[in-house]
């Protein structure tokens, strides 16, 4: 039976360690500061932002919320980003996505100072990642790598298959895996023989948003399975992209949903906010 990779427990330890680091920074008059820009009133975004703020307060990160109305123009949003870019007391900027219709998300991402881009979405951050240079990266991939590390799962030399090619998970995770000496394949909706490909993976990452997309017939015995998906079934039950009950007897390790990758994402956001604050403190 597979080991369950407990993201709640690992994230709790990460946050506790960060709290100590932040207390040490406070002795040098440095308070890690995260600016969150929320445009409109997307319910899912509201929940996620509240969770971020709660975690920030728990560990001593200063979290500033900038709410902008649904009718915000592109020019007004870019002006707010520019203002935050030039504020010397702000270490990290996060514009909560998705933005309301009519706003150009990529233009907003491009406008964020790469040295404050805590999501790692800017072209400069992406370039640094693929050049294997120090940079912040998207929080979910960062959290996945931290979770694997916490369980001493070494990716070097492993065959990794990532199902999903989003800029939020699949692509940046591929970069991190390559930088840690894994052999990586990204699969997607146009990939032929996808389940056969998945079955060749030593480490299988699934991020497609389709409940129980992967079952026992697509997993190699002994594989590590990372389930990034989270959906709700007709009965309201939270479901992952992987059928855990079917796959757990085959895999060597698996992330539960909920309680696997999800908690690691916010912990990773906090960790990278602290990293950016340290950079500011060191000049």
Curated annotation (Swiss-Prot):
EC number(s) given by UniProt: 1.5.1.5, 3.5.4.9
Gene3D superfamilies registered for this protein in UniProt: Leucine Dehydrogenase, chain A, domain 1, NAD(P)-binding Rossmann-like Domain
Binding residues for NADP(+): 164-166, 189, 230
Keywords, ordered alphabetically: Amino-acid biosynthesis, Histidine biosynthesis, Hydrolase, Methionine biosynthesis, Multifunctional enzyme, NADP, One-carbon metabolism, Oxidoreductase, Purine biosynthesis
Pathway participation: One-carbon metabolism; tetrahydrofolate interconversion
Any one GO molecular function term: methenyltetrahydrofolate cyclohydrolase activity
Protein's name according to its UniProt entry: Bifunctional protein FolD
């Amino acid at each position: 039976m597979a080991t369950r990779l407990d993201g709640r427990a690992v994230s709790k330890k990460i946050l506790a360690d960060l709290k100590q680091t932040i207390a040490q920074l406070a002795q040098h008059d440095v308070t890690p500061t995260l600016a969150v820009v929320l445009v409109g009133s997307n319910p899912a975004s509201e929940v996620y932002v509240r969770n971020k703020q709660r975690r920030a307060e728990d560990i001593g990160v200063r979290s500033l919320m900038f709410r902008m109305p649904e009718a915000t123009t592109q020019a007004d949003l870019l002006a707010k980003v520019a203002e935050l870019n030039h504020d010397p007391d702000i270490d990290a900027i996060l514009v909560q996505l998705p933005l309301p219709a009519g706003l150009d998300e990529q233009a907003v991402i491009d406008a964020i100072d790469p040295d404050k881009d805590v999501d790692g979405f800017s072209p400069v951050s992406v370039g640094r990642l693929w050049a294997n240079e120090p940079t912040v990266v998207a929080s979910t991939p960062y959290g996945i790598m931290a979770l694997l590390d916490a369980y001493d799962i070494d990716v070097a030399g492993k065959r990794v298959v990532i199902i999903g090619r989003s800029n939020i998970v699949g692509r940046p995770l591929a970069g991190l895996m390559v930088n840690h000496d894994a052999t990586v394949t990204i699969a997607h909706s146009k990939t032929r023989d996808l389940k056969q490909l998945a079955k060749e993976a030593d480490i299988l990452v699934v991020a497609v948003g389709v409940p129980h997309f992967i079952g026992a017939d697509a997993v190699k015995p002994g594989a590590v399975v990372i389930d990034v998906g989270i959906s709700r079934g007709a009965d309201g039950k939270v479901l992952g992209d992987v059928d855990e009950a079917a796959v757990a007897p085959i895999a060597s390790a698996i992330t539960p949903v909920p309680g696997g990758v999800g908690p690691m994402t916010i912990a990773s956001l906090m960790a990278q906010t602290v990293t950016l604050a340290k950079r500011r403190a060191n000049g």
